[in-house]
Amino acid sequence: FSLKPEYGHKPEYGLKPEYAIKPEPSVKNAEISVLEAELQSMRKLLESMNRQMEKLDGEQGVWPVPLQKWADLLRERGISPQLIKRLLRTVQQEVREEDWPDEERVRASIRGSIRQICSKTAAIQPGVLKPRVVALIGPTGVGKTTTIGKLAAGFSIVDKRRVALITADTYRVAAVDQLKTFGEIIGVPVEVVMTPSSLKEAIARHQDKELIFIDTAGRSPHHELHMSELRAFLEKAQPDLTMLVMSAATQAADLAKIYERFANLTTHLVFTKMDETVCGGTILSLLDRTELPVAYITNGQNVPDDIEVATPERLTRYILGEED
């Protein structure tokens, strides 16, 4: 049994179109709202996925296009991947995404972060009632003797201070001769000592000076006997400042090892040969991990010109290659 077709119902075909129940407009609007909400939810999900992908890319050394050029530049300057990540994460926090193509804004953010890492600086101050005793230590070949010559010339000739030089570097005759020559040229007394006790006596003879610089033999950080000898000299000298001299042209991993071996003897840092590397950023990882201040940087062989008091701005410029 079935209704006749004229009554509008065929079980096998359903209602005729003219008899079909049409949805109310409010129902259509509700369906559209649901679809729009679903699209908005999908859009947010995609944005979140993009952010996660960008984060993963940053960890793997790949960044959004406007920041990738900065990642490449920082890498070329010898800055570690970990620090690059930190610097660019700070950019993402401080600079709106639409401003990332603005080189000045991005550079300002990066410079600000690097300046903060380089904020610990302190130069030598001459003694007042007694001489300030300054010892320079470090591995071989980093330019300790030349650095002492620059410091002595600067303080004696430019600042008119009373200065004495003492060398305990008896391993290298050339170093002794070099320091004696410096002394003769700038009119500063130079003493050569062979033992820790004679070093103490030499310091006592120059109590009328404002500054006494001590040149020590270059020591291999891996040679325990050499390190023991250095400690013996420093124990007798009791310097007010002990400056660890390191070459900025040294690879970051080697800088870290040198620092670890000398750190317990050190009060200040000096970086030499800043002019001999295009990877000035190698020192940044070390500065990030130490509380020791940087006193001086050197950028050539000329005495006394090629030495500068370290400042956060000056270090930042060298690290970013802005001194070239």
Say what each PLM segment does.
Residues T170, A175-V176:
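Post-nucleotide-binding-loop coupling segment downstream of the phosphate-binding loop, primarily
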Residues F1-K10, K16-K28:
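Asparagine/serine/threonine-enriched low-complexity, disordered tracts
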Residues R132-V134, V163, E210-I214, T242:
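Generic beta-sheet signal
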Residues I137-G138, D215-A217:
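Glycine-rich beta-strand-to-loop/alpha-helix junction loops that act as flexible
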Residues K22-V163, T167-T170, T181-F182, I186-P196:
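Primarily NTPase-proximal linker/entry elements flanking Walker-type ATP/GTP-binding cores
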Residues A168-T170, T216, K273:
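Generic detector of well-ordered alpha-helical packing
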Residues Q178, I185, M194-R205, L211, ...:
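Conserved catalytic-core segment of NTP-binding enzymes
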